[in-house]
A protein has these predicted regions:
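Predominantly soluble domains enriched in secretory-pathway, periplasmic, or organellar proteins
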Residues: 1-365
Length: 365
């Protein structure tokens, strides 16, 4: 059932919504997804991310050059253009107005700020648009230039920091202690480590071809990086800021999600279309399940009992039980679901459909 279809009229909301919670009643693995909202408008969402304080951000790439912000009820709060004056942020080599291309978002632990990666930058002093088939050498030959991460103040909903990272940054994550921002640079084959206190990149860690998903341990000691151009996950020590290891997970790992207690890592495998469960005590895959063609993003319920996976070419979302990775439900979406988030305020699941929709599913008893 569809409750309503939203247009683009802004409304107001408070960023001091209730704290994240586990919904009362049955656990998430005893609930089922029901479509309740379809949000349209001038959007082309690559990703969608809930703040868990009552806001949801959709990143609309270079197709719209915006980030659209909604409240947990699905009302549009603000459309944030990706335009900045780079000179005002301390980058005099890029005069005039610069556009970004918002890809993914990551909130600080208190949700006071959200960091947004930009696929490429468009303006004076920047090279050509990046590509998904680049390599460090081909990017250098083409004259590609580093991209930037924006920080957005979730109270004012305005960009207040611009941070240089690598070539075609995609995923990013903030450590639970709020100290580090970790960014995967797709074309640089490395990861940027940013000190959030100074908004400065302090390390670039080589990890392998096409790094994508990132998860960080609950104690903020270790970052896990999915190497989509391979079959492994790389570990980075967040004290030494160095690569410390690697373990096999399967072909083309894309998204990483960690269990609330940090015991297990869940991985989407883009090529095989499988979701796998890794025991982090042994770094071994202990379960896997096929969910659909061209598996992309994944989210986890607050109680840690369920996963939600989008299957890009199957046009579906699959819900899995984390204990045994069995399929609980598969629901249809629009064409090319690509992003997904779990809103801990409502227990709803939001799906970004690349062709121009956000779908909201209630996880109902």
């Amino acid at each position: 059932m569809i409750r309503r279809v939203h247009g683009t009229t802004p409304t107001t909301t408070s960023t001091t919504s209730p704290f994240a919670r586990i919904p009362t009643g049955p656990s998430s693995n005893q609930r089922h997804l029901v479509l309740i909202d379809t949000i349209t408008g001038a959007i082309s969402p690559k990703s969608v991310d809930a703040s868990d304080t009552g806001l949801v951000f959709a990143q609309n790439m270079m197709y719209r050059h915006t980030v659209t912000v909604y409240d947990s009820s699905g009302n549009l709060v603000k459309t944030i253009p990706d335009t900045v004056d780079m000179t005002a942020f301390g980058f005099p080599g890029h005069p005039g107005i610069t556009h970004g291309a918002p890809v993914e978002a990551a909130f600080t632990p208190d949700a006071r700020y959200v960091y947004v990666s930009n696929y490429s930058m468009y303006g004076a002093g920047f090279g050509p648009e990046g590509s998904d088939t680049c390599t460090p050498s081909s990017a250098e030959a083409a004259g590609d230039t580093n991209s930037y991460v924006y920080r957005i103040d979730t109270r004012t909903l305005s960009i207040d920091q611009v941070i240089e990272v690598g070539l075609v940054p995609k995923y990013l994550a903030v450590s639970p202690d709020g100290k580090w921002l970790v960014v995967s640079n797709w074309c640089s084959f490395d990861v940027s480590i940013v000190d959030t206190a100074t908004a400065t990149q302090v390390a670039r860690v080589p990890v392998g071809a096409y790094p994508r998903g990132i998860a960080i341990s609950p104690n903020s000691s270790e970052a896990y990086i999915a190497i989509m151009g391979g079959d492994n996950v790389v570990t980075i020590d967040l004290q030494s800021l160095a690569k410390t290891g690697s373990f096999f997970v399967g072909e083309n790992p894309r998204q990483l999600v960690m269990s609330p207690d940090g015991s297990y890592l869940y991985v989407t495998l883009n090529g095989p279309g499988e979701a796998v469960k890794v025991d982090l005590a042994t770094d071994q895959v202990v379960a896997s399940t096929y969910t659909g063609e061209d598996e992309r993003s994944m989210a986890i319920a607050t109680d840690g009992q369920s996963l939600y996976v989008v299957n890009y070419l199957s046009d579906t979302v699959t819900k899995l039980r984390t204990s045994d990775m069995s399929i609980l439900q598969t629901v249809s979406t629009g064409v090319h679901p690509v992003g997904i988030t779990y809103d801990a305020i409502t227990g709803d699941v939001w799906v970004a459909v690349y062709t121009g929709q956000l779908l909201v599913f209630a996880d109902t008893p």
